[in-house]
Swiss-Prot record:
Cofactor note: Binds 1 heme b (iron(II)-protoporphyrin IX) group per subunit. Binds 2 calcium ions per subunit.
Keyword terms: Calcium, Disulfide bond, Glycoprotein, Heme, Hydrogen peroxide, Iron, Metal-binding, Oxidoreductase, Peroxidase, Pyrrolidone carboxylic acid, Secreted, Signal, Vacuole
Binding site for substrate: 168
Residue sites binding Ca(2+) 2 per the record: 200, 251, 254, 259
Keyword Iron among record annotations: yes
Other noteworthy facts: There are 73 peroxidase genes in A.thaliana.
Principal cellular location given in the protein's record: secreted
Protein name: Peroxidase 32
GO BP, sorted A to Z: hydrogen peroxide catabolic process; response to oxidative stress; response to salt stress
Organism, scientific name: Arabidopsis thaliana (Mouse-ear cress)
Ligand binding (heme b): 199
Length: 352
C-alpha cells in the first residue's frame, strides 16, 4: 500500500478525533441492560438458541455455563479471561486447579461468538456473551429471567495464578468461603448463600467428595454433618477405590432443574460438597442458616436473591469504555490490537 505524508496526516487526525470522541463518550461507561439495544439486539436470541440446541444432547450444559461465568468473575472480574487459551505470554486459567478437567462449555461459547460476529461484527464482547449465556442458561433450566447489565470488554491476558488463589475450593470451611467472597467484594451473606444455590443443578466429580465419604479431616471417618442415608448412596456411586471422575448430581431431587431444592437438601444434611453443607451445619453459620431456611421455604425469595447476587457478581471490576478490547475469537487476543481498536473507533463514531 502506498501511503503519502498527507494521507498519513489525515489518518492521524481522524484517529485522534476518533479517540477523543470515543473517550468522551464511553471512557466512564457504566453497565446497562440496554447496551446492545441499537447495535446488536439479536445477541440474546442467538445465545439462547445456541443453548437450546446444545441442551438436546448435553443436559449438563446449562449448569456448566453458569459455572464458567462464576469462575470468570472471581478472577480479576468478569472479563472473559477464563476463555483464553495458552500463549507464550501467559498461561490459561483453564489449567488452574479449580478449572482443569472440570470447567467445560468452551466450544458452546465459541459457537455463540461466531454467530454473534456474523450478525454484529466487532460489537459484543466475549465477557458479555458469557454473562448473557449464564442468565439464559438459568432461565432455560427453570430459573428466573432478568435483564443483565452489559457493556463489558475483554481482558488482554489470563490470570492462572489468581485462578488458583481466588476460586473457592470444595473443601473450604465457612470462614474460608466467606473470605473468598469478601475478597472480590461480595460481602453480604446473601451473596454467598444465593450464589451457592447455583449448585441446584449440574454434577460434580467423586474426587471432590472422597474425603467427606471416607476420611474427613484425616479422622478415618465420614463427615459427621452428612446424612447417613445419603452417605450410603454416595458411597455406592463413589466407592473407595473407584473411578474418581464419575459424576454425581449436586441436587438429588431435581438434578437438571434450577429451583430451591438445593436448600431443602441442606436442611436435611444432604449437601454434596463440604462448602454446600457448611452454609447450614457450620458453627459459624449463624448468618447463613436463616437464609438457607428462607430460600428452602420460598422459591421466589431464592430467585430474587439470586438475581441480585448475580448482578453484583457481574459488576466485579468490569473492563469498560476504552479498557481491554472486543475479541473476535474468545480464545485469543486480537492479533492486531491497534488496527482492531481503530476499526472499533470508526464503527463507534459512525454510529453516533
Amino acid at each position: 500500500m502506498n501511503f503519502s505524508y498527507s494521507s498519513l496526516s489525515t489518518w492521524t487526525t481522524l484517529m485522534t478525533l476518533g479517540c477523543l470522541l470515543l473517550h468522551s463518550s464511553i471512557s466512564s461507561a457504566q453497565l446497562t441492560p440496554t447496551f446492545y439495544d441499537n447495535t446488536c439486539p439479536s445477541v440474546f436470541t442467538i445465545v439462547r438458541d445456541t443453548i437450546v440446541n446444545e441442551l438436546r444432547s448435553d443436559p449438563r450444559i446449562a449448569a456448566s455455563i453458569l459455572r464458567l461465568h462464576f469462575h470468570d468473575c472471581f478472577v480479576n472480574g468478569c472479563d472473559a479471561s477464563i476463555l483464553l487459551d495458552n500463549t507464550t505470554s501467559f498461561r490459561t486459567e483453564k489449567d488452574a486447579a479449580p478449572n482443569a478437567n472440570s470447567a467445560r462449555g468452551f466450544p458452546v461459547i465459541d459457537r455463540m461468538k461466531a454467530a454473534v460476529e456474523t450478525a454484529c461484527p466487532r460489537t459484543v464482547s466475549c465477557a458479555d456473551i458469557l454473562t448473557i449465556a449464564a442468565q439464559q442458561a438459568v432461565n432455560l433450566a427453570g430459573g428466573p429471567s432478568w435483564r443483565v447489565p452489559l457493556g463489558r470488554r475483554d481482558s488482554l491476558q489470563a490470570f492462572f495464578a489468581l485462578a488458583n488463589t481466588n476460586l473457592p475450593a470444595p473443601f473450604f470451611t465457612l470462614p474460608q468461603l466467606k473470605a473468598s467472597f469478601q475478597n472480590v467484594g461480595l460481602d453480604r451473606p446473601s451473596d454467598l448463600v444465593a450464589l451457592s444455590g447455583g449448585h441446584t443443578f449440574g454434577k460434580n466429580q467423586c474426587q471432590f467428595i472422597m474425603d467427606r465419604l471416607y476420611n474427613f479431616s484425616n479422622t478415618g471417618l465420614p463427615d459427621p454433618t452428612l446424612n447417613t442415608t445419603y452417605l450410603q448412596t454416595l458411597r455406592g456411586q463413589c466407592p473407595r477405590n473407584g473411578n474418581q471422575t464419575v459424576l454425581v448430581d449436586f441436587d438429588l431431587r431435581t438434578p437438571t432443574v434450577f429451583d430451591n431444592k438445593y436448600y431443602v437438601n441442606l436442611k436435611e444434611l444432604k449437601g454434596l460438597i463440604q462448602t454446600d453443607q457448611e452454609l447450614f451445619s457450620s458453627p459459624n453459620a449463624t448468618d447463613t442458616i436463616p437464609l438457607v431456611r428462607e430460600y428452602a421455604d420460598g422459591t421466589q425469595k431464592f430467585f430474587n436473591a439470586f438475581v441480585e447476587a448475580m448482578n453484583r457478581m457481574g459488576n466485579i471490576t468490569p473492563l469498560t469504555g476504552t479498557q481491554g478490547q472486543i475479541r473476535q475469537n474468545c480464545r485469543v487476543v486480537n492479533s492486531n490490537s491497534l488496527l482492531h481498536d481503530v476499526v472499533e473507533i470508526v464503527d463507534f463514531v459512525s454510529s453516533m
